[in-house]
Amino acid sequence: MNTATGFIVLLVLATVLGCIEAGESHVREDAMGRARRGACTPTGQPCPYNESCCSGSCQEQLNENGHTVKRCV
C-alpha cells in the first residue's frame, strides 16, 4: 500500500467514524431533552419555577437556616 492509498483509507475511516459519532450525539441530545422535559420536582424540594413541580404549585417557605426559599407543595 502506498502513501496515497493509505491516506485515502484513513480519510474514509475518519469520515465514517465522524458520521457515526455525530449520529450518536444527536440521539443522546434528544433523549436527554425528553428526560428533562418529562421530569418534575417532588414535594418539599426547592423549585425555581412553578411549572417544574409535580404538583404544579411552588410556595415560599423558611428553610432550616431561616432563609426564605421556594419549595414545591
From Swiss-Prot:
Disulfide bonds join 40-54, 47-58, 53-72. One of its GO terms (molecular function) is calcium channel inhibitor activity. One of its GO terms (biological process) is defense response. InterPro entries: Omega-atracotox. It is found in: Secreted. The keyword Lipid metabolism does not apply. SUPFAM superfamilies: omega toxin-like. Keywords: Calcium channel impairing toxin, Cleavage on pair of basic residues, Disulfide bond, Ion channel impairing toxin, Knottin, Neurotoxin, Secreted, Signal, Toxin, Voltage-gated calcium channel impairing toxin, Voltage-gated sodium channel impairing toxin. Its main location: secreted. The record marks 46, 63, 71 as: Critical for insecticidal activity. Residues 23-37 form a propeptide. Expressed by the venom gland. GO terms for cellular component: extracellular region. Residues 1-22 form the signal peptide. Pfam families: Omega-toxin (PF06357). Belongs to the neurotoxin 08 (Shiva) family. 01 (omega toxin) subfamily. Insecticidal toxin that reversibly and voltage-independently blocks both mid-low- (M-LVA) and high-voltage-activated (HVA) calcium channels (Cav) in cockroach DUM neurons. Also causes a modest block of insect sodium channel currents (Nav). Induces potent excitatory symptoms, followed by flaccid paralysis leading to death in house crickets. The presence of a 'disulfide through disulfide knot' structurally defines this protein as a knottin. This toxin comes from a female specimen. It is observed that propeptide sequences coming from female specimen have only limited homology with the male paralogs, but the reason is unknown. This is Omega-hexatoxin-Ar1b.
